[in-house]
Every structure is written in C-alpha cells, then in structure tokens.
Amino acid sequence: KPAYLHPAAKVPRKVEAHALLSPFDNLIWFRDRTERLFDVKIRLEIYTPAEKRLHGYYVLPFLQGETITARVDLKSDRQAKVLLVQAAHAEPDARPDTAEALAIELSRMAGWLGLERVQAVGKGDLAAPLSQALSKM
C-alpha cells in the first residue's frame, strides 16, 4: 500500500532512539500500518482470557532504532517499589543487544514511576536474557 512523505521532510540516515510504546500510541494503534511498517502484529490482549493470551495483558512494544525488537508485559508493585516484567518476548528482528537496551529503558521507566528497581519474573524467550542484563545494572 502506498505511504506518503512530505517533499520537504528530511529523513535521517539512521535513527537510534529507544522507546517503550503504549498500545494506544498512534504508531501502534493503527494495526495495519504497524504491520506494514514493522512487520509485526501487535494485539491488545486485555479482553482475551488469560489462558489464551500470547504475550500478556497490557503489552508494550519496544522500539529499538527503527525496528520493534521486543514486547513486554509490565506490572508495578508500588508497595515493594518494583517494576515487574511479567513477560518479555523477542521479535524475529531482535538485535543481539536488545536485552541490554530494553533493560536500560525499563530502568528509566521505573525511575519515572518512582520505583527503585526492575525485576524480570515472567515468561517469554527474552525473560532470561533480560534478567541477566538487569542484574548487571
């Protein structure tokens, strides 16, 4: 499908920013466009019964540079001051440094939320590498 770019828009050669994206972010909310741009299917699973969820209740995609490389399901334990990673899944285009980059972003998010640390406690193929990356911080 066609996409449009303003003729005066300057396109950077390479983008290296990292961000955890809300499922309600415009970049994610228009699912057809998300699939075209990033070749990933992001579905909001909050209305899906727990036993049928693939990635988690409220999953945040991780944008690493120009690629969605992972997705995480998070929960804040405010009493313990911990950001819990209930699930961490790598995307097919995940980079070798995805776990480390994600650990940094999760630590930033924890600080922003007034939490003291991040702990990977859940499932997913990225959970163990993420836990290891978090232990080095």
Question: Where does each model-flagged region fall?
Answer:
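Long, charged, low-complexity, helical-prone intrinsically disordered regions
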Residues: K1-M137
